[in-house]
Amino acid sequence: MALNLQDKQAIVAEVNEAAKGALSAVIADSRGVTVDKMTELRKVARENGVSMRVVRNTLLRRAVEGTEFECLKDTFVGPTLIAFSTEHPGAAARLFKDFAKANDKFEIKGAAFEGKIQDVEFLATLPTYDEAIARLMGTMKEAAAGKLVRTLAALRDKLQEAA
């Protein structure tokens, strides 16, 4: 279906707004994936705060100009599915990685975070906010417990020497 100039400008503006509000972006090629599976992917994406869209490469190049995802321009070859993570930087990467495991024809082309091209594995393994807080609390708790054990051991040694 041919798009007129106003439609193209609207698409560019919409994708540009999504890019400006996103934490990360992941690019994929979904050729060969059934409509049912893509519909399921879109549903899961919405639940995880990920906005997905298939966009023509020329429009996508214009849409990402001036954003931190401009570094992805070289990956805009062939059919391009772009996903922007708005709530967590690793959400789209994790979603696409899991989907690619179940669907051989789904190919992840690239990802960007903080203005740089990143490995999808790196983004997919980023901890969520809650996971990061839990890790930090665990580390702090371990440090406090270790300090207590060392203090008690030193006190025991001091008492043994005095006896």
Swiss-Prot record:
Tagged with keyword Ribonucleoprotein: yes
Q: Which GO terms describe its molecular function?
A: large ribosomal subunit rRNA binding; structural constituent of ribosome
Q: Name one process (GO BP) from the record.
A: translation
Keyword line: Ribonucleoprotein, Ribosomal protein, RNA-binding, rRNA-binding
Q: Name one Pfam family in it.
A: Ribosomal_L10
Tell me the superkingdom of the source. Answer: Bacteria
What are the GO cellular component annotations? large ribosomal subunit
What family is this protein classified in? Answer: Belongs to the universal ribosomal protein uL10 family.
What is the annotated role of this protein in its UniProt record?
Forms part of the ribosomal stalk, playing a central role in the interaction of the ribosome with GTP-bound translation factors.
Q: How does it assemble?
A: Part of the ribosomal stalk of the 50S ribosomal subunit. The N-terminus interacts with L11 and the large rRNA to form the base of the stalk. The C-terminus forms an elongated spine to which L12 dimers bind in a sequential fashion forming a multimeric L10(L12)X complex.
The protein's matches in HAMAP family, at most eight in alphabetical order, are given as: Ribosomal_uL10
Listed name of the protein:
Large ribosomal subunit protein uL10
Q: Which species is listed as the source?
A: Pasteurella multocida (strain Pm70)
